[in-house]
Protein backbone atom coordinates (compact mmCIF):
# COMPACT_ATOMS: atom_id res chain seq x y z
CA UNK A 1 0.00 0.00 0.00
CA UNK A 2 1.36 3.40 -0.97
CA UNK A 3 1.20 6.59 1.04
CA UNK A 4 -0.85 8.23 -1.68
CA UNK A 5 -3.68 5.76 -0.89
CA UNK A 6 -3.93 7.03 2.68
CA UNK A 7 -6.12 10.03 3.42
CA UNK A 8 -4.11 12.97 4.70
CA UNK A 9 -7.02 15.14 5.80
CA UNK A 10 -9.66 14.09 8.31
CA UNK A 11 -13.00 13.31 6.70
CA UNK A 12 -16.01 15.41 7.57
CA UNK A 13 -18.73 13.65 9.52
CA UNK A 14 -21.37 12.02 7.31
CA UNK A 15 -19.27 11.98 4.12
CA UNK A 16 -17.84 8.81 2.68
CA UNK A 17 -15.32 9.45 -0.12
CA UNK A 18 -16.07 6.04 -1.67
CA UNK A 19 -19.73 6.88 -2.41
CA UNK A 20 -20.88 9.51 -4.89
CA UNK A 21 -23.00 12.38 -3.61
CA UNK A 22 -26.69 12.55 -4.44
CA UNK A 23 -26.09 14.53 -7.62
CA UNK A 24 -22.78 12.94 -8.64
CA UNK A 25 -24.14 9.55 -9.74
CA UNK A 26 -23.60 9.39 -13.52
CA UNK A 27 -26.55 6.98 -13.93
CA UNK A 28 -29.02 9.43 -12.38
CA UNK A 29 -31.20 11.18 -14.96
CA UNK A 30 -31.30 14.95 -14.94
CA UNK A 31 -34.50 16.52 -13.63
CA UNK A 32 -35.96 13.30 -12.19
CA UNK A 33 -36.87 13.52 -8.54
CA UNK A 34 -37.27 10.44 -6.37
CA UNK A 35 -40.88 9.60 -5.50
CA UNK A 36 -41.90 10.09 -1.91
CA UNK A 37 -42.88 6.84 -0.17
CA UNK A 38 -46.15 6.86 1.74
CA UNK A 39 -45.77 4.18 4.40
CA UNK A 40 -46.19 0.53 3.47
CA UNK A 41 -48.15 1.40 0.32
CA UNK A 42 -45.44 3.32 -1.52
CA UNK A 43 -46.17 3.76 -5.22
CA UNK A 44 -44.77 1.14 -7.56
CA UNK A 45 -42.26 2.47 -10.14
CA UNK A 46 -44.90 2.04 -12.87
CA UNK A 47 -47.39 4.03 -10.80
CA UNK A 48 -49.86 1.42 -9.57
CA UNK A 49 -50.14 0.36 -5.94
CA UNK A 50 -48.97 -3.10 -4.98
CA UNK A 51 -51.85 -3.84 -2.62
CA UNK A 52 -55.11 -2.41 -1.40
CA UNK A 53 -55.09 -0.28 1.75
CA UNK A 54 -56.35 -2.07 4.86
CA UNK A 55 -59.96 -1.47 5.85
CA UNK A 56 -60.99 0.85 8.67
CA UNK A 57 -61.45 -2.16 10.95
CA UNK A 58 -57.72 -2.97 10.56
CA UNK A 59 -55.36 -3.67 13.36
CA UNK A 60 -54.00 -6.72 15.01
CA UNK A 61 -56.42 -9.28 16.45
CA UNK A 62 -56.08 -10.18 20.10
CA UNK A 63 -55.57 -13.90 20.69
CA UNK A 64 -57.42 -16.16 23.07
CA UNK A 65 -54.90 -17.51 25.54
CA UNK A 66 -54.98 -20.22 28.15
CA UNK A 67 -56.89 -23.48 28.52
CA UNK A 68 -59.58 -21.84 30.65
CA UNK A 69 -60.69 -19.54 27.86
CA UNK A 70 -60.97 -22.46 25.44
CA UNK A 71 -62.79 -24.62 28.03
CA UNK A 72 -65.31 -21.82 28.68
CA UNK A 73 -66.03 -21.58 24.96
CA UNK A 74 -67.31 -25.17 24.97
CA UNK A 75 -70.49 -23.79 26.55
CA UNK A 76 -70.69 -20.98 23.98
CA UNK A 77 -73.04 -20.56 21.05
CA UNK A 78 -72.07 -22.55 17.98
CA UNK A 79 -72.44 -22.24 14.22
CA UNK A 80 -71.31 -24.71 11.56
CA UNK A 81 -70.21 -24.16 8.01
CA UNK A 82 -68.85 -26.42 5.31
CA UNK A 83 -65.19 -25.76 6.19
CA UNK A 84 -65.40 -24.08 9.61
CA UNK A 85 -67.13 -24.30 12.98
CA UNK A 86 -67.35 -21.27 15.27
CA UNK A 87 -68.08 -20.91 18.97
CA UNK A 88 -68.41 -17.63 20.83
CA UNK A 89 -69.31 -16.05 24.15
CA UNK A 90 -69.96 -12.35 24.88
CA UNK A 91 -66.93 -10.57 26.35
CA UNK A 92 -65.53 -7.11 27.06
CA UNK A 93 -63.21 -7.24 24.01
CA UNK A 94 -62.83 -9.21 20.80
CA UNK A 95 -60.40 -12.10 21.21
CA UNK A 96 -59.95 -14.84 18.64
CA UNK A 97 -58.64 -18.39 18.80
CA UNK A 98 -58.03 -20.35 15.60
CA UNK A 99 -57.70 -24.14 15.72
CA UNK A 100 -56.42 -26.11 12.72
CA UNK A 101 -55.71 -29.75 13.56
CA UNK A 102 -52.96 -31.87 12.06
CA UNK A 103 -55.63 -33.77 10.13
CA UNK A 104 -55.83 -30.73 7.84
CA UNK A 105 -52.28 -31.13 6.59
CA UNK A 106 -48.67 -30.26 7.21
CA UNK A 107 -47.58 -27.07 8.98
CA UNK A 108 -47.38 -25.02 5.77
CA UNK A 109 -51.01 -25.81 4.91
CA UNK A 110 -52.24 -25.25 8.48
CA UNK A 111 -50.43 -21.91 8.73
CA UNK A 112 -51.84 -20.76 5.38
CA UNK A 113 -55.38 -21.44 6.61
CA UNK A 114 -54.68 -19.60 9.88
CA UNK A 115 -53.27 -16.58 8.03
CA UNK A 116 -56.29 -16.45 5.75
CA UNK A 117 -58.73 -16.73 8.66
CA UNK A 118 -56.91 -14.04 10.66
CA UNK A 119 -57.07 -11.68 7.69
CA UNK A 120 -60.78 -12.37 7.13
CA UNK A 121 -61.54 -11.80 10.82
CA UNK A 122 -59.46 -8.61 10.85
CA UNK A 123 -61.49 -7.20 7.95
CA UNK A 124 -64.87 -7.98 9.55
CA UNK A 125 -66.46 -5.57 12.01
CA UNK A 126 -67.25 -8.13 14.71
CA UNK A 127 -68.88 -7.34 18.05
CA UNK A 128 -66.96 -7.81 21.29
CA UNK A 129 -66.78 -11.53 22.04
CA UNK A 130 -64.43 -14.41 22.61
CA UNK A 131 -64.48 -16.30 19.33
CA UNK A 132 -63.13 -19.75 18.49
CA UNK A 133 -62.80 -20.77 14.83
CA UNK A 134 -62.17 -24.47 14.15
CA UNK A 135 -61.13 -25.53 10.65
CA UNK A 136 -62.18 -28.92 9.28
CA UNK A 137 -59.89 -31.02 7.06
CA UNK A 138 -61.91 -29.90 4.01
CA UNK A 139 -60.58 -26.35 4.58
CA UNK A 140 -57.31 -27.53 3.02
CA UNK A 141 -58.82 -27.21 -0.48
CA UNK A 142 -60.83 -24.02 0.18
CA UNK A 143 -59.95 -20.72 -1.46
CA UNK A 144 -59.86 -17.42 0.40
CA UNK A 145 -63.32 -16.50 -0.98
CA UNK A 146 -64.80 -19.85 0.07
CA UNK A 147 -63.38 -19.48 3.59
CA UNK A 148 -64.76 -15.94 3.76
CA UNK A 149 -68.28 -17.01 2.73
CA UNK A 150 -68.22 -20.05 5.02
CA UNK A 151 -67.10 -17.99 8.02
CA UNK A 152 -69.88 -15.45 7.40
CA UNK A 153 -72.41 -18.31 7.14
CA UNK A 154 -71.19 -19.93 10.37
CA UNK A 155 -71.16 -16.59 12.25
CA UNK A 156 -74.74 -15.89 11.13
CA UNK A 157 -75.90 -19.36 12.21
CA UNK A 158 -74.30 -18.85 15.61
CA UNK A 159 -76.02 -15.49 16.04
CA UNK A 160 -72.87 -13.37 16.40
CA UNK A 161 -73.69 -11.32 13.28
CA UNK A 162 -76.97 -10.64 11.45
Curated annotation (Swiss-Prot):
More info: The open reading frame (ORF) for this protein entirely encompasses the ORF for the 50S ribosomal protein L34 (rpmH). The two start codons are separated by four nucleotides.
The reaction(s) this protein catalyses: Endonucleolytic cleavage of RNA, removing 5'-extranucleotides from tRNA precursor
Family designation: Belongs to the RnpA family.
EC number: 3.1.26.5
Subunit structure as annotated in this protein's UniProt entry: Consists of a catalytic RNA component (M1 or rnpB) and a protein subunit.
Keyword Kinase included in the entry's annotation: no
Bias kind Basic and acidic residues: ranges: 21-38
Domain of life (superkingdom): Bacteria
Region of interest (Disordered), ranges: 1-63
Name under which the protein is recorded: Ribonuclease P protein component
Major enzyme class: hydrolase
The encoding gene: rnpA
GO cellular component: ribonuclease P complex
Pfam family, one: Ribonuclease_P
GO process annotations (BP): tRNA 5'-leader removal
Purpose of the protein: RNaseP catalyzes the removal of the 5'-leader sequence from pre-tRNA to produce the mature 5'-terminus. It can also cleave other RNA substrates such as 4.5S RNA. The protein component plays an auxiliary but essential role in vivo by binding to the 5'-leader sequence and broadening the substrate specificity of the ribozyme.
Amino acid sequence: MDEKDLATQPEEAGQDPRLPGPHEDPRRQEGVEAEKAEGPLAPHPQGERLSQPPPAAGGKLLSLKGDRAFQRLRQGRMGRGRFLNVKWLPASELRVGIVVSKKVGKAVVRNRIKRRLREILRRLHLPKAHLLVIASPEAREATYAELFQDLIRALKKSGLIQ
